[in-house]
Amino acid sequence: MPKEFFDVFPTLEVNGDMKKLLSETEVTKVGMNHEKDHIRIYLNGTRLIHKKNIYQLEKNIHDQIFKNRHMDVKVIEKYQLSEQYTAEKLMDLYKDSILEELKNYSLMEYNLLRSAKMEFTGDSHLLLTLENTIIAQTRSHEIVEFLEKVVCERCGLDLSVELAFE
């Protein structure tokens, strides 16, 4: 059963803006592995939280709650966004956060996406134009998968990505 974030973590201290955002989220699940050194916290919210703030939240939870233990803290966020959001509007607002996350995942894919041209030909149809290199051609499908995972699974919006190279 979902609980409000600060009902699950009542002693956690975070900065003012983050406190407001987290007060509007719910924790839907907390899971730990058998070795008890990895914890996953599943958040559900209606307002976007930048990935750098999620990383800071993971650090705060680790430092304040698990300070004397080796614990890998992972926050997995999911959003129920209002009808005003389209994939195009989401990309305008959330692109920096997407790039931040991709940078932590793969520097090569981050650089490819950062330098790519993104053009929406419809609310949920993205033409992604990458530099015509062997690296871009071999890694482009990972970028598409990543974008679809963030936009479709995390944010609940439709996105169709068409690749082009120039």
Predicted regions and their residues:
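Intrinsically disordered, low-complexity basic tails and flexible linkers associated
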Residues: 1-166
